[in-house]
Amino acid sequence: MKNPFASAVGLFLLVVCLEQAALPAESPAALPEQRRAIKDLNTPREFPKIASREAWEARAKEIREQVLVSCGLWPMPEKTPLQAHVFGRIERDGYSVEKVYFQPLPRFYLAGNLYRPLGRGKGPFPAILNPHGHWKEGRLADTKDGSTAARCINFARQGMIAFSYDMVGYNDTSFPDYGNVPIEAYYLWHRHFATNQVNLLWNISLMGLQTWDSVRALDFLASLPDVDRKRLACTGESGGGTQTFMLGAVEDRLAAQAPVVMVSHTMQGGCLCENAPGLRVEYSNMEIAAAAAPRPQILLAATGDWTKDTLTVEGPAIEHIYQLLDAQDRFRYVRFNFGHNYNQTSREAVYRWFGKWLLKQPDAASPKEEPYQKEPDADLRVFPDGKLPDDALTEARFVESVKNLHRAQWESLRVRDEAGLEGFKQLMQPAWRHTLHIEWPARVARCRAEGVREIEGFTAAALRIDALEGDASILASYWAPPGILTNPAPKVVVICNGRSDGPLPDAAARPAGLPLALLQHGLAVLVVDRFSTGVPPNQFTNFYTTYNRTKLQERVRDLLTVCAVAGSVADPRGPRFFDVTLLGIGPAGLWALLAAPGSGSVIADCDQLDVASDEALLAPDLFCPGIRNIGAFEGGSILTAPHPLLLHNTGAAFPTDALRSAYRAIGASNKLRVVAARLRDEELVNWISQVK
């Protein structure tokens, strides 16, 4: 009798019906070495087509989460006391200026200058953050093309408080081991922070620290008695423009913002402080800036830099989002005929915008910049001799303190009851998705069965699965036992072999070994190709991970796609759903643990990995920025609870305490099995057959 499944291997369905193709009985061609073109900071980007308010609000939520995860700020650190010091007041015509320093994180000091209105009463006044660009002098730059002091003085004279603060490594914001850095070396030391590859495992980065500095700078302004907390704003140029729209993406306290000469569909930022891991795998600066909508925003562009297309590309794209939110009047974009700048012409455009939204001035009001005199550097410097407070941490000790913060956050998430598991999932599922750069639930565009055939009573097919447009196909081999569709509770085992010394058979061959044993127990089997087997570009070069997935992220993404396909079947009688077991052999067991939430149950060969070893997690096949912030391989495993899990070959250094605690806390200890040794194939088959 003909296998009823053969006619149904118009097989796996999720989104689009599988296409059968009458092809020769041969295996699909090997995957190409590169899955897709490598992106970098200059790769042109397109704004996605957004059709509705709801679609944008959902995407904006994803963007905010991605920014926070990439910056190592998910979950948010505790906001410890700032212990702000404001001193050295100088009074001038219509304004005062003071020196400021405070602690965004304990024993790390952020410094700047606070400009306040004089002769306008006690307030409360609007308050504006002023991050600076990569001028040689940082916040103390005062040239024709850009002057932080010029805009801060004029903001104060117009009735607004202004706070200018340093990038890390500039002027007064540094680490004691940097010494008294000369002006010429500011940028060099700025790019020195957290460049050790190990820091990527924690998403500790220059961009993350500066984003947190901006959040805490906003806290500082909000703490001042003469500040109106409902009228907070931010503006900066170039790298300071990046800080502006990054803050706007994650902080709803901003009432207005003005990123200057930075939002572009081409160049996304050329410094480490603008390129956190994973930030632009899916998103561009255009979308990150648009995440502030519907709050008032003005983009300033120049004909002489990468923002030259703002009138035809970036501006209209973001304007469409404001239109979807019925907030067209809250967005404006202008371009001036200059090079890269924040000059007087650009500043006056921002004065008008902030005057409208922060001071409620009429549209016709056009405040002009008044003549100003910047104070001498020595009178604005907070630590002019480079000597920081005695308790300031060195860079290495500060980085270790941030790692300890993440460790404490992970420990605080330990699951102790069912409510704790739910809380863990709500917090950590976004972290899991954005750390691994996966779409969840996985989407499948097309799945084709090629060369469907009968082999010794089993139905076999080579599968070609397309996840998303532009991706290379995922290739797999499939076998089904007789009567699979008449089984009231059919099971399929997805096998991924991470070893190169024992390839599993393809669909043109008679199944043997583990696949045959599974088939003889009435289980369908899908064996996945090893994905991208070529040598990728150096994943550790600056910015690579900002724009591209690592090999590990690609593999986990593919496993989730395959599991989504394997769980849904085409049957003439209607859709059928298979119970999916994901089985990872060798290093693929670790990939399977990260993909565990996409499967009904998981068997993972843990390869006796020493998870505590940074060197082990920096191996090309296991490297994933931020992986330690999701508990490495335990995080994805806990997210799948209470589904059955079998971890074997754990050895002595693979942590499972948090995982065991979670299963025990919800009364599901019987669903979890952890074995130090590697199990034999027959033991794996028995576990799959018995698990419910």
What is the predicted role of each segment?
Residues 115-117, 131, 165, 235-237, ...:
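Generic beta-strand/beta-sheet core signal
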Residues 121-215, 222-223, 262-273, 487-570, ...:
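Cap/lid segment of the alpha/beta-hydrolase catalytic domain
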Residues 209, 216-281, 562-632:
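Primarily recognizes the serine-hydrolase "nucleophile elbow" in alpha/beta-hydrolase
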